[in-house]
A protein has these predicted regions:
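N-terminal acidic, glycine/proline-rich low-complexity segments
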Residues: 2-175
């Protein structure tokens, strides 16, 4: 068992060098990973895979919401007629409304700490889906725009492992 005090924190490049991976900076693709880390169990593995892929320069991770289902449940009446789960399950989904992005953010902090990676920014995404109006903002969307506008000859890829809300907001901010 490993105590927190025993953990080594290091830069991502240091980890890749220890693993024997060395790809020139100019050959690495720029990637922002958007993930609803707390929604499904596979997202943590996918994010770590990106972080340890030597061909990628991970610019940042955006913690995304997973709100669509709880909103759908909220709109259904009566619950049992159209959904295969019981009322208690629907109540759990309703209780998460507006909180899922923060759940993903906390999971992202935990994941980076467990991996010992301290140089990849973790940003908060939108707390919910877009409801058709302008003016939505998220730290993650602002980061996407900032990275996209950088003077860098390499293209920027945004890998969405969950909701595309922050990418849509970024596009609305800077088409």
């Amino acid at each position: 068992s490993c105590r927190d005090a025993d953990r080594i924190s290091m830069k991502r490049d240091e980890i890749l060098k220890r693993l024997g991976f060395g790809i020139p900076h100019a050959s690495r693709i720029r990637v922002i990973v958007c993930s609803d880390l707390k929604n499904e169990a596979d997202d943590q593995y996918a994010v770590i895979h990106h972080l340890l892929s030597p061909s990628e320069e991970i610019c940042g991770i955006v913690a995304c919401h997973f709100e669509w289902f709880s909103r759908r449940v909220q709109q259904q009446t009566p619950i049992g007629e159209q959904w295969p789960f019981v009322k208690e399950d629907a109540e759990i989904l309703r209780s998460r409304r507006g909180k899922t992005m923060e759940m993903s953010f906390a999971e992202g902090k935990k994941l980076l700490a467990l991996a010992g990676i301290d140089d990849v920014p973790l940003l908060r995404g939108s707390p919910s889906e877009i409801e058709g109006h302008d003016g939505m903002f998220s730290e993650g969307a602002e980061f996407i725009v900032h990275e996209a506008m950088k003077d860098d000859p390499r293209p920027l890829y945004v890998c969405c492992l969950g909701a595309i809300t922050d990418l849509a907001i970024a596009y609305k901010m800077q088409p």
